[in-house]
């Protein structure tokens, strides 16, 4: 274990000592028969039932998992892989170089944590990896007696629920978040697919928790805005000159100059541009400015088949099904003269940062995470531990070559490719942008050099293309980390020529991304090489307005390489500065999102409480008490002199709450009360009438249908108001920076206004819930003579479904809709449905508990 001598990490030293204990058990479990080894899972579970901690069985569980991996996959995890697994079980990030077998490393910690029966989720960056790992690693877990599930997009709810109920669930990261949001939009608790978020192990953790940290997961609904405003602001922005706006190259922020503001005021006929009344227009204008002057085609997005497709700037892949939110997507559509989609309304949203922080325990694997350790600690409370390679790295990382111009750089790149190709050494060229990969593609065509291009426009058979990049003579151009997760294995001939040569055409915004590109070469001790070619024209230098200065200093070099340590230090300094800025930006996003997170936690908790309660009468009565205090605050109930208008109060309460009740408020009900006493008096009467109505409904329909109606009334009001609140907070977030002009703190203002909005949200939920409950259509029978009558519904095929009158009014349409769906089903299934509908009330009620069983 000489390679461990220099490791100083406390976690690593702890893992090293545990590794010795694990190795000491090798002979013990090697002597076990297959059945004896499999039975250890039951032994561990029995110990856990007796409140033995996971930590106390960790050593044995890891040793068992190691032996099982060998027997099933014929691969015995290396010592460094076991150490990596221990780091993961500590709830930290294990940094393992590319090709070191992170997937095998995950087996032991996943096995150990799955023994509790609370569920373990393994999150991957795409569905291909989720399917692959669930199949391959799943063999080991199933052999050991654990169940393995695969969660995919567009799966039916029942299959998703089954996948999450497994001991171990593999899933792409985005679907985990969307399932969480959808679970908090269901109408019954039984419809949820996820269980408690216990332990998540994230593969490529830096990609998900760092690169995609700012990207919110959004479930959208109905249209919220007209498209005309996008067209108008787009037309206006096209008239602007470069003196009308200013771009901060460092932060990519864009704002109108004083001249631009005057031009805007004149165009839109405003006296004052920056006030909250004009915030909607300013928001659209900012999006149009950003779309035209900051967002670059073939960099952040591409246009394919008349559609705007987003490009992951870190991988170069198209992000399927993703779009910019808050109107930026529509602004880009207007810019590119494609059809403008109506902006959708946000129904639910959460960032990856806040979703994964919901897990009780979190860990992750990556090839490059140490440079972002402070962010992992600050936001996720996860340390990053570097795991040594099993075999020393043999790759040679050559110093970068720097050129004055973009053209000179690519001229040198082509010459280098020609030199390497002449001796059949395989080359992987990494570019940061689609347009650069296309540019190099044209240059290589002119030189008659056979090559393959992999970018957002050319991404078919990605894994296959990347896998073949190690064949002797292969030239592969890929945007950044396309093909991440797929091994590049050089053949024997290419290894003789020096192995895979990774050629980077510019430095990225993070050293981590550059290290990922280098890591494609030299896996498991293979030989390999890497070198970066960079120029003063590169975005890294342009962002800090250093381009002209450096070009003037080094003009004498023309097309030749710049030999100067100062310029290389400038690139390193710029890269570190951008890393810091991006971290601050992600932390700022988290601060704002934490305001919504706290509110979301309250709403979702209340929502679950409503779904789980069998009797909501106390909840309704508390709403009545709360609402009664709010009613007399309504301004329209007061005269010009400020006195409470009792007549207006009577009319308002009767109209909103007493439509179907025998009782009606009169002036006499309030004349003998002072204003301070009215809320309590009003509350007492409303509760009395509510109890009478509920008693009637329970007697006629049963407790379950009555509670079901009340539950749906409250959930409906809660969902509607919460969705409105989310969109209101979105708009506030976009416009709040305007308060800087009045010397106010935007975040403080956002928090204060957001809190007031949330307090109003709570009141509005109670108000709307009561309006529905107190006007329950089923209660209209209270004022009629005679018995309930069953209703017969004739379906399209002529058959008749009989619906008992004691079925709550609000779900009758859902029953009919489901019946129509069943027209396509077998006759036997329809008979079961009709039998249940016509059976005694208890059976009907049971069916209503879970509409997915209808």
From Swiss-Prot:
<feature type="binding site">
    <location>
        <position position="81"/>
    </location>
    <ligand>
        <name>ATP</name>
    </ligand>
</feature>
<comment type="similarity">
    <text>Belongs to the SecA family.</text>
</comment>
<dbReference type="GO" id="GO:0005829">
    <property type="term" value="C:cytosol"/>
</dbReference>
<keyword id="KW-1278">Translocase</keyword>
<dbReference type="Pfam" id="PF07516">
    <property type="entry name" value="SecA_SW"/>
</dbReference>
<dbReference type="InterPro" id="IPR001650">
    <property type="entry name" value="Helicase_C-like"/>
</dbReference>
<keyword id="KW-0813">Transport</keyword>
<dbReference type="GO" id="GO:0031522">
    <property type="term" value="C:cell envelope Sec protein transport complex"/>
</dbReference>
<dbReference type="GO" id="GO:0005524">
    <property type="term" value="F:ATP binding"/>
</dbReference>
<dbReference type="InterPro" id="IPR011116">
    <property type="entry name" value="SecA_Wing/Scaffold"/>
</dbReference>
<keyword id="KW-0547">Nucleotide-binding</keyword>
<dbReference type="InterPro" id="IPR014018">
    <property type="entry name" value="SecA_motor_DEAD"/>
</dbReference>
<keyword id="KW-0472">Membrane</keyword>
<dbReference type="GO" id="GO:0008564">
    <property type="term" value="F:protein-exporting ATPase activity"/>
</dbReference>
<dbReference type="InterPro" id="IPR044722">
    <property type="entry name" value="SecA_SF2_C"/>
</dbReference>
<dbReference type="InterPro" id="IPR000185">
    <property type="entry name" value="SecA"/>
</dbReference>
<dbReference type="Pfam" id="PF21090">
    <property type="entry name" value="P-loop_SecA"/>
</dbReference>
<keyword id="KW-0963">Cytoplasm</keyword>
<keyword id="KW-1003">Cell membrane</keyword>
<protein>
    <recommendedName>
        <fullName>Protein translocase subunit SecA</fullName>
        <ecNumber>7.4.2.8</ecNumber>
    </recommendedName>
</protein>
<dbReference type="GO" id="GO:0005886">
    <property type="term" value="C:plasma membrane"/>
</dbReference>
<dbReference type="InterPro" id="IPR011130">
    <property type="entry name" value="SecA_preprotein_X-link_dom"/>
</dbReference>
<dbReference type="InterPro" id="IPR027417">
    <property type="entry name" value="P-loop_NTPase"/>
</dbReference>
<feature type="binding site">
    <location>
        <position position="487"/>
    </location>
    <ligand>
        <name>ATP</name>
    </ligand>
</feature>
<keyword id="KW-0067">ATP-binding</keyword>
<dbReference type="InterPro" id="IPR011115">
    <property type="entry name" value="SecA_DEAD"/>
</dbReference>
<dbReference type="Pfam" id="PF07517">
    <property type="entry name" value="SecA_DEAD"/>
</dbReference>
<dbReference type="GO" id="GO:0065002">
    <property type="term" value="P:intracellular protein transmembrane transport"/>
</dbReference>
<comment type="subunit">
    <text>Monomer and homodimer. Part of the essential Sec protein translocation apparatus which comprises SecA, SecYEG and auxiliary proteins SecDF. Other proteins may also be involved.</text>
</comment>
<dbReference type="GO" id="GO:0006605">
    <property type="term" value="P:protein targeting"/>
</dbReference>
<dbReference type="GO" id="GO:0043952">
    <property type="term" value="P:protein transport by the Sec complex"/>
</dbReference>
<dbReference type="InterPro" id="IPR036266">
    <property type="entry name" value="SecA_Wing/Scaffold_sf"/>
</dbReference>
<feature type="binding site">
    <location>
        <begin position="99"/>
        <end position="103"/>
    </location>
    <ligand>
        <name>ATP</name>
    </ligand>
</feature>
<dbReference type="InterPro" id="IPR014001">
    <property type="entry name" value="Helicase_ATP-bd"/>
</dbReference>
<keyword id="KW-0653">Protein transport</keyword>
<comment type="function">
    <text>Part of the Sec protein translocase complex. Interacts with the SecYEG preprotein conducting channel. Has a central role in coupling the hydrolysis of ATP to the transfer of proteins into and across the cell membrane, serving as an ATP-driven molecular motor driving the stepwise translocation of polypeptide chains across the membrane.</text>
</comment>
<dbReference type="GO" id="GO:0017038">
    <property type="term" value="P:protein import"/>
</dbReference>
<keyword id="KW-0811">Translocation</keyword>
<dbReference type="Pfam" id="PF01043">
    <property type="entry name" value="SecA_PP_bind"/>
</dbReference>
<dbReference type="InterPro" id="IPR036670">
    <property type="entry name" value="SecA_X-link_sf"/>
</dbReference>
């Amino acid at each position: 274990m000489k390679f461990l001598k220099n490791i100083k990490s406390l976690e690593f030293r702890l893992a090293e000592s545990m590794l010795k204990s694990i190795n000491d058990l090798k002979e013990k479990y090697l002597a076990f028969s297959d059945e004896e080894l499999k039975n250890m899972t039951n032994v561990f579970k029995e110990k856990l039932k007796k409140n033995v901690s996971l930590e106390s069985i960790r050593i044995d569980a890891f040793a068992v998992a190691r032996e099982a991996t060998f027997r099933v996959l014929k691969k015995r995890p290396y010592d460094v892989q076991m150490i990596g697994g221990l780091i993961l079980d500590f709830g930290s990030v294990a940094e393992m170089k590319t090709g070191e077998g992170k997937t095998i490393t995950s087996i032991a910690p996943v096995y150990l944590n799955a023994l509790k029966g609370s569920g373990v989720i393994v999150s991957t960056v795409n569905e291909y990896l989720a399917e692959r790992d669930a199949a391959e690693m799943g063999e080991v877990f199933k052999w050991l007696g654990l169940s393995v599930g695969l969660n995919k997009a567009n799966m039916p709810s029942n299959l998703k629920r089954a996948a999450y109920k497994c001991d171990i669930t593999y899933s792409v990261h985005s679907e985990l978040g969307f399932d969480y949001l959808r679970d908090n939009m269901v109408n019954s608790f039984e419809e949820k697919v996820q269980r408690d978020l216990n332990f998540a192990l994230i593969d490529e953790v830096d990609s998900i928790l760092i690169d995609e940290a700012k990207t919110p997961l959004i479930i959208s609904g109905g249209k919220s805005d007209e498209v005309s405003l996008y067209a108008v602001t787009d037309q206006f922005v096209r008239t602007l000159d470069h003196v009308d706006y200013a771009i901060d190259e460092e932060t990519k922020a864009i704002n109108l100059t004083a001249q631009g503001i005057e031009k805007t005021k004149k165009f839109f006929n405003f006296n004052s541009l920056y006030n909250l009344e004009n915030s909607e227009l300013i928001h659209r204008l900012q999006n149009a400015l950003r779309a035209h002057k900051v967002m670059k085609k073939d960099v952040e997005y591409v246009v394919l088949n008349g559609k705007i497709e987003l490009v992951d700037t870190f991988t170069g892949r198209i992000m399927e099904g993703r779009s910019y939110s808050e109107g930026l997507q529509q602004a880009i559509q207007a810019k590119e003269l494609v059809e403008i989609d109506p902006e959708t309304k946000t129904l639910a949203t959460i960032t990856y940062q806040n979703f994964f922080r919901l897990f009780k325990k979190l860990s992750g694997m990556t090839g490059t995470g140490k440079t972002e350790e402070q962010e992992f600690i600050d936001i996720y409370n996860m340390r990053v531990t570097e795991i040594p390679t099993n075999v020393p790295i043999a790759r040679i990382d050559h110093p970068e070559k720097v050129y004055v111009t973009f053209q000179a750089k690519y001229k040198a790149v082509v010459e280098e490719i020609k030199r390497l190709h002449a001796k059949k050494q395989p080359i992987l060229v990494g570019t940061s942008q689609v347009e650069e990969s296309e540019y190099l593609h044209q240059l290589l065509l002119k030189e008659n050099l056979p090559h393959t291009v992999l970018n957002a426009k050319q991404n078919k058979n990605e894994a296959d293309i990347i896998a073949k990049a190690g064949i002797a003579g292969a030239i592969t151009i890929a945007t950044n980390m396309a093909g991440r997760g797929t091994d590049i294995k050089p053949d024997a001939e290419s290894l003789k020529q020096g192995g895979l040569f990774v050629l980077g055409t510019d430095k990225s915004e993070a050293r981590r991304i550059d290290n990922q590109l280098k890591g494609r070469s030299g896996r498991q001790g293979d030989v390999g090489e890497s070198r970066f070619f960079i120029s003063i024209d590169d975005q890294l230098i342009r962002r800090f307005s250093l381009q002209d200065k450096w070009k003037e200093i080094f003009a004498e070099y023309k097309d030749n390489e710049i030999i100067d340590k100062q310029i290389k230090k400038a690139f390193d300094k710029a890269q570190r500065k951008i890393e810091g800025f991006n971290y601050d930006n992600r932390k700022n996003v988290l601060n704002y999102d934490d305001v919504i997170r706290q509110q979301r936690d309250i709403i979702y908790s209340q929502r679950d409480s409503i779904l789980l309660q069998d009797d909501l009468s106390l909840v309704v009565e508390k709403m009545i008490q709360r609402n009664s205090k709010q009613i007399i605050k309504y301004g329209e109930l007061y005269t010009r002199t400020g006195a409470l208008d009792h007549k207006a109060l009577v009319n308002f309460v009767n109209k909103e709450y007493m439509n179907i009740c025998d009782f009606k408020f009169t002036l006499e009900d309030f004349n003998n009360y002072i204003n301070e006493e009215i809320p309590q008096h009003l509350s007492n009467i409303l509760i009395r009438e509510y109890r009478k109505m509920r008693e009637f409904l329970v007697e006629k329909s049963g407790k379950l249908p009555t509670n079901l109606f009340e539950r749906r009334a409250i959930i409906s009001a809660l969902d509607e108001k919460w969705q409105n609140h989310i969109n209101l907070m979105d708009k506030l977030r976009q416009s709040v920076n305007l308060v800087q002009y009045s010397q106010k703190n935007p975040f403080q203002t956002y928090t204060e206004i957001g809190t007031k909005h949330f307090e109003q949200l709570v009141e509005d939920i109670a108000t709307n819930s009561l309006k529905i409950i107190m006007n329950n259509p089923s209660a209209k029978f209270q004022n009629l003579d005679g018995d309930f009558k069953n209703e017969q519904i004739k379906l399209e095929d002529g058959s008749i479904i009989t619906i008992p009158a004691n079925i709550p009014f609000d779900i009758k349409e859902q029953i009919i809709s489901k019946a129509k769906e069943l027209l396509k089903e077998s006759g036997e299934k329809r008979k079961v449905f009709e039998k249940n509908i016509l059976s005694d009330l208890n059976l009907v009620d049971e069916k209503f508990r879970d509409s997915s069983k209808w």
